[in-house]
Amino acid sequence: MKEFDGKSAFITGGASGIGLGMARAFASAGMKVAIADIKSELLSKAKADIEARGVECLTIELDVSDRTAVRQAATETVAAFGKLHLLCNNAGVGGINRPLDEAEDLDWDWVINVNLMGAVNCLLAFIPLLKAHGEGGHIINTSSVSGLRVYDGRGQGIYATTKFALVGMTEALEQDLKPLGIGVSLLCPGFVKTELPNAPRNRPAKFGGPVAPGHTSNSSLSAAAASGMEPDDCGKLVLNAIKNDEFYILTDGNERDLIQARFDRLTEAIERAAEVTF
């Protein structure tokens, strides 16, 4: 996807953080932007921000775990813009610092239904719209560096499970959509200045309500996020990756050694397997 002016994008989790950074980058390139977010109090400010860049902006209060609501959002977006060219599955939650041996049913339900099934719901609703006009398009799925390796220490399991799943799903999606002229990219941000670590404070009642403070993000991860990349810079990286049809998008090189360590363990296992005799 090389041309952006006059085309349209739909972004989940778009009213703040990385999502808003992408919205600003796309708007600056001339795209019409639909911003969907569960945090309704942020939508009006985000709309004004995007419209100030001279493009149309549609805002939709949306819980991506609600498949029916996602389909309604797709219908509303096409009614407003006519066509859809770019889908960004960016909505996500994290911050439950609870080891897997202590995790509760609703912890799993919440994170899986937002991080993984939220993306699935959007793919089901929006891919037909991307295919319909025959002009091609692009899909961004936001995973995490935690989808490439697990941070040290207990309590990261549920989040990492969903982010690893997004990596596999997106790698398969690229193969499925490539013949149709629809590009796919996998965004794996490291630490970016977002409110993700605070998400458990706002967990919906249907998933158990706010998480107890003792089980929210540990202080070291929260501090790292607070000093991370600016969301606008992340948005610019994404725009550039779409232009260049890049699949993997990482936000910095600081995780190289830790990611390499995981693949070194895999390589060692391959070498051991090659030596096995029965």
Which residues fall in each region the model found?
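Substrate-binding pocket helix/loop in short-chain dehydrogenase/reductase
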Residues: 98-100, 104-109
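Active-site helix of classical SDR
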Residues: 123, 162
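Residue(s) in the substrate-gating loop at a strand-loop-helix junction
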Residues: 144
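SDR active-site lid
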Residues: 179-249
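Active-site-adjacent segment of SDR/Rossmann-fold oxidoreductases
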Residues: 29, 149, 172-182
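The beta1-alpha1 cofactor-binding region of Rossmann-like NAD(H)/NADP(H)-dependent oxidoreductases
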Residues: 40-41, 61-72, 105
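Canonical Rossmann dinucleotide-binding motif of NAD(H)/NADP(H)-dependent dehydrogenases/reductases
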Residues: 2-34
